[in-house]
Amino acid sequence: CQAQQTEPRCIAQCSLTNIEFRRAVELFNQAHEGTPADRLCQETITERQRLLYEQSATAMVNAVNARPDHEQAPQALIQAAIALECTSRNDSAMRLYSRVIDEVGPRQGRTPEETEALTAILAQAYFRLAFSANRNFDYDSAVQSYRVLADDRRFAGAAQREVRTDALINAARIFEYQQNYTQAADYYRRAAEAVQDIETRRVAHYRVAEMSYRRRDWAGTIREMQGFLDRYRGDGGAGELLVTAAWRIVEARQQLRQERDTRAALQNVVSTYERSGQQPGSAAAEFASQARFTIANEGLPPLRESVRVAPGRQPTVQSFVQAIRTQIDNDAREVRTVVDGYAPVLGYRRPTWTIAAFVQQGQAYEILASAIINATLTPLPDDLQQRMRRASADVRSEVELQFQDQVRQVLEEQIRPVECFAVARYALAARAARAGAIDNEFTRTAVARLQSYGDERIAECIAQQQAQDASFGAYTPGEFQRARPGQTLPMDPGLAAPALAGADE
């Protein structure tokens, strides 16, 4: 029992065999019946259990007071304190743990075995005192007790390794909660060096790096996170932490405004995720999808500058129209490259970035549509200008209008399918947002852009998309309607909010 004093069942069931404690132990066991093996106390107890715990604690304390020099007196006090913990009387439990520390601390064992037993009891008292203080929001007292376990050479032996490393980690967590990140990092580092469990050591090493991030030490974040990546790169169980560490480096690079290094760090997040074995939809996939989206999004601003429809001077009307078609085809390929860059984001199955990718794809198509709408139709083709020189002003005006109508027909043929591509992407984004109850800048953009097209055009575009993809849901009139700020949507006749349930229901 003393060798495993951090195990809940062992703590609660240490053998108190002497007659003085037998009745108290019986009461404790009755109260403790049904408690899971991995818990010190049940989450909720009945009134009967509460009375039994209190009677057990009182009986043990009375027995100790009658025989304070009894060899099992310290363990009886600890079990009495546990009984009080189970009734949420943390202050009373803390006083008993402190009493054990005061009485056992100065004692020296006559044999190595007795010394080890006293050390185990003392470690148990310090740990439970710290735990109770933490639960009682007395963080300074908790840290003080944990630091004794972590720093006192009396607890440095192998027999107390587990309780000592638990104390290091718990102290680090309290320091982190108090935003004392430097101290937290120190205790996490010591825990990583002392702990035997592989997973606990891995997490402790990561928390050391995370403390640099928390205190906004960006250079330290890069150094510590890269160190974690190097240490655990081949560890199959570190997948999520590896991706998180890679993302922290991205954030640090962004804060330092290191644009070139940020781009490389983003790509490293994607690569780390691919090697990690993490599944789509996981927490690690969130960072990978954001990284992939950010990389893809770099192509959108240049698109606004490069996509233009301006055929320039052409010898004939036919060559002018052909030049327009060629430019639109070239621009469409450029847009398609940007659109395809967002496609991998969808595979991570993270709603926020899936929606963002759909919206940005829609934006890319609308850039092309806008370029087609605003196509430059001057200068007029040479053959047309020659004809117009010999004509009257009225004829020249008529010829120019006919030319513009001819070109506009060509442009109209090109623009409608492009707009429908955009509408389909916005519709996917809006539907995903509604299904996930997500409201952000991308979802609002999707709805706003859909409303600009109107019901008839949306229905037409979605019908075209359905013809190509049977899984694409049909459009419901008003599906993407949204109230303007400060206004409400009208409620359809016959609809009403459900009645409120009565107080007795």
Name every feature range the model reports, one short phrase each.
Residues 1-505:
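Acidic, polar-rich low-complexity tracts and alpha-helical solenoid repeat scaffolds
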